[in-house]
């Protein structure tokens, strides 16, 4: 994920005012404009708070999720039906939940009667809910059902509303998601930890004149029985995935599409009337996927990849499985009014997020402590990819200015921190998305690559991705 600065840099302020800044400013400031950094690009380490991870006595196998957003009232209704494994007998289920009201909950052991929850104990500070049951849930598999409601918030996290203006000048809203680091719990009750993976069957009930997107391709679209103005859109089952990589979008979009040379359908969604501005990102993505496939010697595991420009988006971009979300300025290129530095920036952003489809999505770090591997690796290989696809950019010269030198300057400060930071409470996670994790992490990976040599480095990447695909890994595994 690329994150924007908390204290706006000069480049970020210019981005808000209009067209991208001139090349020199992009060269110096583009890194900090993508990341949630403090005034010097170095996050202050948070005070440690007591924290316990979710108990392991109940875990999900598959989550069937149906959401019905209301784009006028800014609310949503949801139904979760999770196939779960009870590993240790218990009379409660602890999940992550924030800013959501649970209406009903029940658990049905396989082949047995449904047991209705008798209480919901919200631990708001820890963003958890405990579902209490009147009898013990025995070991084995069963189905957890939860009905809930929530708000399409205006905080650009969780399931939120994004304001846009139609070509005719009308203000409307899209419903979009941003779940990294710990905000899937704001869209549905879930096991919102990187190490807990499940498959997802997602359905969206949306206005029939809106585009509905999610991680996988659409497998069914039919009229909604209770309202002739709505349709229910069902998506194919995802691979096993962590909750922070789940995504869905409902809005009005144009698109351009192509196929990469290895047969993956690539689609770029743009605001209505701006499809032409998505063609450069489409070209980059179509070149990037085969490069990573060849470099890792691991094929892209899904049939399609969607890239979409979001009007209101806090992050620079987010690598959701198969539905990568971007700020408009990080994805769209006006072919008549853009400079070379703008194209280079978009190429780097696309290269970064698509690298995560392998390094982060296919193989996921076990906990946020290992963020520097996830983001440091993507921040390095984005340059390798762009240099291969667009050698005329001479992009490695920008790495020295934008990452290597910046990492050295920040690491020399008294308030610097180790490249790997122990993380516990959710409030601590965002604090490590800084230039040490990204730029120093990328610089260390670059040194390792140069020391080992490209041939052996590629061999090691293949072994790592093959061994841990669809699983979690820690720094020691690499």
Curated annotation (Swiss-Prot):
Protein purpose: Aminopeptidase with broad substrate specificity to several peptides.
Family, according to the entry, reads as follows: Belongs to the peptidase M1 family.
One GO BP: peptide catabolic process
Task: Relay the cofactor remark from the entry.
Answer: Binds 1 zinc ion per subunit.
State the organism named in the record.
Answer: Homo sapiens (Human)
PANTHER family xrefs: PROTEASE M1 ZINC METALLOPROTEASE, PUROMYCIN-SENSITIVE AMINOPEPTIDASE-RELATED
Keyword Zinc included in the entry's annotation: yes
Annotated site location: Transition state stabilizer: 438
Q: State which Enzyme Commission number(s) the record gives.
A: 3.4.11.-
Phylogenetic lineage? Eukaryota, Metazoa, Chordata, Craniata, Vertebrata
Q: Which UniProt keywords apply?
A: Aminopeptidase, Hydrolase, Metal-binding, Metalloprotease, Protease, Zinc
Q: Which domain of life is it from?
A: Eukaryota
- The positions annotated for binding Zn(2+) are 352, 356, 375
Q: Does the keyword Transcription feature in the UniProt annotation?
A: no
**Active-site residues per Swiss-Prot or TrEMBL entry:** 353 (proton acceptor)
Residues binding substrate: 180, 316-320
Gene Ontology CC: cytoplasm; extracellular exosome; extracellular space; membrane
One matching Pfam family? Peptidase_M1
What InterPro entries does the annotation carry?
Aminopeptidase_N-like_N, Aminopeptidase_N-like_N_sf, M1_APN-typ, Peptidase_M1, Peptidase_M1_aminopeptidases, Peptidase_M1_dom, Peptidase_M4/M1_CTD_sf
Q: What is the protein's given name?
A: Puromycin-sensitive aminopeptidase-like protein
Give the cofactors, semicolon-separated: Zn(2+)
Q: Cite a single GO MF annotation.
A: peptide binding
């Amino acid at each position: 994920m690329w994150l924007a600065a908390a204290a706006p840099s000069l480049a970020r302020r210019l981005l808000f005012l209009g067209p991208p800044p001139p090349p020199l400013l992009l060269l110096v400031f583009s890194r900090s404009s993508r990341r949630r950094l403090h005034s010097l690009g170095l996050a202050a380490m948070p005070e440690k708070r007591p924290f316990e991870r979710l108990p392991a006595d109940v875990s999900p196998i598959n989550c069937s999720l149906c959401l019905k957003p209301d784009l006028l009232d800014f609310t949503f209704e949801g139904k979760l039906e999770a196939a779960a494994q009870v590993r240790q007998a218990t009379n409660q289920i602890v999940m992550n939940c924030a800013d959501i009201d649970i209406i009903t909950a029940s658990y049905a052991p396989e082949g047995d009667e449904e047991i209705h929850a008798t209480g919901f104990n919200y631990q708001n500070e820890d963003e958890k809910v405990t579902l209490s049951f009147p009898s013990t849930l025995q070991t084995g598999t069963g189905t957890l059902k939860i009905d809930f409601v929530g708000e399409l918030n205006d905080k650009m996290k969780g399931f939120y509303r994004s304001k846009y203006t139609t070509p005719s000048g009308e203000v409307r809203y899209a419903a979009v998601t941003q779940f990294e680091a710990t905000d899937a719990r704001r869209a549905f009750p879930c096991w919102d930890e990187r190490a807990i993976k499940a498959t997802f069957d997602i359905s969206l009930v949306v206005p029939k004149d809106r585009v509905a997107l999610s991680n996988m391709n659409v497998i069914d679209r039919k009229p909604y029985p209770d309202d002739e103005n709505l349709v229910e859109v069902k998506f194919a089952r995802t691979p096993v995935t962590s909750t922070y990589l789940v995504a869905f979008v409902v809005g009005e979009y144009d698109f351009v599409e192509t196929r990469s040379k290895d047969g993956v359908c690539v689609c770029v969604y743009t605001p209505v009337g701006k499809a032409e501005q998505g063609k450069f990102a489409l070209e980059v993505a179509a070149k990037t996927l085969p490069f990573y496939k060849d470099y890792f010697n691991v094929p892209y595991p899904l049939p399609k990849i969607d890239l979409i420009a979001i009007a209101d988006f806090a992050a620079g971009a987010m690598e959701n499985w198969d539905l990568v979300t971007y700020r408009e300025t990080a994805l769209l290129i006006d072919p008549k009014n853009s400079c070379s530095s703008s194209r280079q920036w978009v190429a780097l952003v696309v290269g970064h997020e698509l690298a995560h489809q392998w390094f982060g999505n296919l193989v996921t770090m076990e906990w946020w402590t290992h963020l520097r591997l996830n983001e440091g690796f993507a921040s390095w290989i984005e340059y390798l990819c762009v240099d291969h696809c667009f050698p005329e950019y001479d992009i490695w010269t920008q790495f020295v200015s934008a990452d290597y030198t910046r990492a050295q300057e920040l690491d020399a400060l008294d308030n610097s921190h180790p490249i790997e930071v122990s993380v516990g409470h959710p409030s601590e996670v965002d604090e490590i998305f800084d230039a040490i994790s990204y730029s120093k992490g990328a610089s260390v990976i670059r040194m390792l690559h140069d020391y080992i040599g490209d041939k052996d480095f590629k061999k090691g990447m293949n072994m790592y991705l093959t061994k841990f695909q669809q699983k979690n890994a820690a720094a020691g595994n690499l």
